[in-house]
Amino acid sequence: MARIVLWRHGQTDWNTVNRFQGHTDIPLNSVGLFQAQHAARELAALKPTAIIASDLLRTQQTAQALSELLNLPVQLDPRLRETHGGSWEGRTGDENRKEDGENFTRWLTGGDIPAGRTGESRSQVAARAVAAINEALLVQHETVVFVTHGGTSRCILGELLDLPVEKWGILGGLANASWSILETHQNHISGKWLLVEHNAGTIPEPQMGDFDGDVNA
């Protein structure tokens, strides 16, 4: 059996104002650091064999909390980064609705279009992130924690559960420092994945669970 944990990073200051982070390298705030430590104590009970994180600071800081408990190194993979948001990065949801309303609304409601016109589509994010997971599972066959982002985790879930991209929005977004768990008893590349937990964790400062949750990922 292979088991993967998709763990979203803790809160940042940009999360609190719904500002699109994307590839912008924003650190955790004090709440986010607390969330990471709190969640790490629960995730340690799963006895993961590897921790693999996006190379952005907010995910590295989150992963470090679990690394210190388990004495496991954090492996970095930029393919686990958040969606590149193009012109939307650094702007709030309200600003993007005002300045690029038609495209932003289409993207929020599930359109598989480039974020911020020059950024990534959801299918592009899923392709790179799932490739990273598949490669990791070639050498790690037990429980692997992937520390990633709200938008990216939704794309991974949609792809692994074989949902059409326009339906990925039915998967509520992960709150900061919360996680989802998937398992397969088959080949991890060609087999079926089962979602056994979603948005798990008892973490303060919950975030939005609809497509708007991608904005402050």
Where are these regions (language model features)?
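Short glycine-enriched, charge-decorated loop/helix-capping segments at active-site entrances
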Residues: R19-P27, R91-G93, D112, D212
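Glycine-rich phosphate-binding loop signature in dinucleotide/nucleotide-binding domains
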Residues: A44-K47, A136-E142
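General small-molecule cofactor/ligand-binding pocket signal
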Residues: V5, Q75-D77, V196
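Short glycine/proline- and acidic residue-enriched helix-loop micro-motifs
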Residues: E102-Q124
